[in-house]
């Protein structure tokens, strides 16, 4: 190894960097390294192939053509057609513990890049970069991509695709020669946004095998890339997708690339998830107090804001044990449907003649917090704001972008528009006891210009600034990121919000998969998971309360249902379930998520185990009918093999629909060793499709 080298190590992974011939080379990102590493460069130095370079080339992480690299570079840009090719040299190398900062300089191109790597104790690698223009002329940046090398054993990738009400569906495929790109061009991360891009081996499952994951910390346009070159080398990367002219650096100006947050796991996809979750939980900004049981009134009242009707909802919510109530869309000026009012963030006296203060007091007097819905980035053409300032929308030339849900996008890069949203929102918050806001974003950005230039980059920075200012002005305020459901769930906005609305789809059967894969990166306590109505408003499907309640339990739980229509038995079960959630949320929101590699594709077995292996709560979920009479046994990993555990089924929201004469005997209670639970397990109950049962496992 050279004198300029650094080994960053965590219990689960290592990153080895070395300066070779002026370039920074990542020699290893993967399993932990130890011992004498001095001979690694000699051991892995490539041979000279036929019809190739006369000497080995080391393009390093800048991936430059000037160093013989034939793939996609890290940096692309120019000075009016000049300085299009760079050859950076490492000019400073600072290694401190598990962090390293490297400065690269190209005096000919008059550019400087500072790249930092930080590996935390959970194995999460944070990669940042700042590009600075050292010259006197402007530098137009096309793109800056963070890259990490992949070993050849990583022959597959896993990413995620989706649409409204059906987010984050897994896509697993082979890595072929070429450059493979997943782009998000919505101006927000999007329903089709891949929350992570994961390279893995064919043998990798939830519980076993190697995986290399990346997740971009950005809420605007972005792209993930996997590249395999004809020489056999392969890499994974991500960055902001810049539109033409979005970043032009004048003399002395800098561009900070969105961070890339990456994890290596030798323990499958659950190892990846565990690292991300522990990393998020270690943040100073991570929610500290218990996640309040929430009632969102949207599917109960929609735009029918009748005070007596809402009070009746509050009365039932109080009986059940709700801790936070959210008044959704429809409270502000002229908002009688979704065609008008966006942009006019003042209380509508026609609907609330005495304002919101009386209903908030009614809610607070029952010991319940109050939350309110906003969609500050949007404006309806039928609004006072748009009539006064039609120039405040994102647009190009004299064109008006096509409407989406009767909305246009307000240009928050415009000082007047930004201040309008900030001041009107802040005024409502200052005048009322509002603990929480649900911030929606219900359309994509197209033809999104700002004063004649592309405006998505600026818009993304502006919403971050707006959230930060609202929290500064209103200490303790919690913000939920919603975008037609789960279209802004990412590691860019996460330090500014306290909750994500996972999906507009409250159908528990659909939510099982949506929540399963969203939690691949996002800790469950940050994901809104609600009991929807008996007859789903999105799918029309009718589901048992026990299924809906079990599904909602594994996240930041809540209800989105007109509970005044619930039967007495349903209300009783909701109260029992609410009590169960409160008693167990500390475990559910701090433990390790486990997704068992269950052999029957018609069912899920998942849960949360305590880090000290003292207890676990699992759900067995029958998605569709099994092909055999008796499903595969339920086996539980991540327990103490030598420990003794009690195992029983629990029914806080009533029993599921069984398809059997007598249930398995263990459901009323059995004692087994951790090793037996992992190797033999217990008999699976025969459930009707779209049903679930909760299983408690407690160490004796």
Regions picked out by a protein language model, each given a short descriptive name:
Residues 12, 196, 598-641:
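Carbohydrate-binding surface patches
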Residues 4-16, 24-227, 644-662:
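Polysaccharide-binding surfaces and accessory modules of carbohydrate-active proteins
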Residues 247-265, 690-697:
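Short Pro-Gly-centered flexible turn/kink motifs
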Residues 12, 129, 252, 325, ...:
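Conserved, mostly hydrophobic/aromatic
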Residues 288-423, 436:
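Aromatic-lined carbohydrate-binding/catalytic grooves of carbohydrate-active enzymes
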Residues 55-85, 206-222, 263-285, 322-329, ...:
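Glycine-rich, aromatic-flanked loop segments that form ligand/cofactor-binding clefts
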Residues 353-355, 389, 393-546, 556-558, ...:
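Active-site neighborhood of glycoside hydrolase catalytic domains
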Residues 624-700:
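C-terminal beta-sandwich/jelly-roll accessory domains of carbohydrate-active enzymes
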């Amino acid at each position: 190894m050279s004198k300029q080298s650094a080994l960053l190590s965590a219990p689960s992974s290592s990153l080895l960097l070395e300066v070779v011939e002026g370039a920074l080379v990542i020699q290893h990102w993967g399993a932990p390294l130890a011992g004498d590493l001095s001979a690694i460069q000699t051991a892995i130095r490539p041979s000279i192939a036929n019809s190739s370079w006369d000497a080995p080339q080391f393009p390093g992480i800048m991936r430059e053509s000037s160093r013989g690299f034939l793939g996609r570079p890290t940096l692309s840009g120019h000075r009016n057609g000049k300085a299009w090719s760079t050859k950076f040299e490492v000019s400073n190398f600072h290694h401190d513990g598990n962090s390293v900062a490297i400065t690269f300089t190209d005096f000919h191109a008059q550019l400087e890049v500072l790249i930092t790597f930080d590996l935390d104790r959970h194995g999460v690698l944070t990669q940042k970069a700042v590009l600075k223009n050292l010259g006197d002329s402007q530098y137009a940046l096309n793109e800056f991509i963070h890259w990490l090398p992949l070993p050849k054993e990583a022959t597959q990738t896993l990413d995620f695709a989706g649409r409204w009400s059906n987010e984050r569906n897994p896509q697993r495929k082979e890595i072929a020669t070429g450059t493979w790109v997943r782009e998000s061009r919505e101006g927000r991360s999007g329903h089709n946004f891949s929350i992570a891009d994961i390279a893995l081996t064919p043998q990798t499952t939830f519980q076993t095998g190697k995986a290399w994951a990346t997740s971009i910390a950005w809420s605007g346009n972005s792209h993930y890339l996997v590249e395999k070159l004809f020489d056999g080398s392969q890499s994974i990367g991500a960055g902001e997708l810049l539109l033409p002219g979005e970043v032009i650096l004048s003399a002395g100006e800098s561009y900070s690339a969105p961070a890339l947050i990456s994890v290596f796991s030798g323990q499958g996809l659950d190892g990846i998830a565990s690292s991300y979750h522990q990393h998020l939980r270690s943040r100073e900004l991570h929610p500290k107090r218990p996640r309040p049981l929430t009632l969102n009134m949207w599917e109960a009242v929609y735009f029918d804001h009748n005070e007596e009707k809402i009070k009746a909802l509050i009365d039932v919510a109080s009986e059940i044990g709700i801790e936070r109530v959210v008044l959704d869309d429809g409270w502000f000026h002229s908002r009688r449907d979704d065609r008008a009012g966006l942009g006019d963030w003042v209380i509508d006296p026609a609907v609330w003649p005495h304002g919101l203060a009386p209903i908030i007091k009614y809610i607070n007097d029952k010991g319940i917090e109050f939350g309110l819905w906003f969609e500050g980035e949007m404006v309806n053409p039928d609004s006072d704001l748009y009539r006064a300032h039609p120039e405040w929308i994102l647009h190009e030339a004299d064109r008006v972008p096509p409407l989406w849900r009767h909305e246009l996008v307000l240009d928050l890069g415009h000082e007047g528009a930004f201040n309008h949203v900030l001041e009107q929102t802040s005024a409502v918050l200052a005048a009322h006891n509002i603990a929480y806001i649900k911030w929606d974003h219900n359309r994509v950005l197209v033809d999104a210009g700002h004063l004649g230039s592309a405006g998505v980059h600026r818009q993304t920075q502006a919403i971050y600034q707006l959230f930060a200012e609202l929290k500064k002005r209103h200490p303790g305020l919690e913000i939920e990121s919603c975008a037609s459901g789960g279209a802004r769930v990412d590691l860019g906005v996460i330090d500014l919000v306290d909750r994500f609305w996972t999906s507009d789809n409250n159908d528990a059967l659909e939510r099982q998969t949506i929540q399963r894969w969203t939690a691949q990166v996002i800790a469950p306590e940050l994901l809104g998971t609600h009991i929807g109505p008996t007859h789903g408003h999105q799918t029309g499907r009718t589901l048992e309360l026990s299924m809906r309640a079990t599904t909602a339990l594994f996240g930041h739980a809540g209800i989105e249902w007109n509970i005044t229509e619930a039967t007495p038995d349903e209300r009783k079960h909701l109260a029992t379930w609410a009590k169960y959630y409160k008693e167990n949320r500390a475990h559910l929101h701090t433990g390790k998520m486990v997704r068992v590699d269950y052999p029957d594709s018609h069912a899920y077995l998942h849960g949360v185990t305590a880090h000290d292996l003292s207890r676990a709560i699992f759900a067995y979920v029958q998605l569709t009918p099994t092909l055999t009479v008796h499903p595969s046994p339920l086996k539980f990993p991540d327990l103490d093999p030598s420990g003794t555990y009690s195992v029983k089924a629990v029914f806080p929201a009533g029993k599921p629909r069984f398809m059997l004469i007598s249930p398995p005997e263990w459901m009323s209670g059995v004692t087994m060793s951790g090793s037996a639970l992992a190797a033999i397990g217990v008999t699976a109950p025969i459930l009707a499709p779209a049903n679930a049962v909760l299983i408690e496992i407690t160490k004796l």
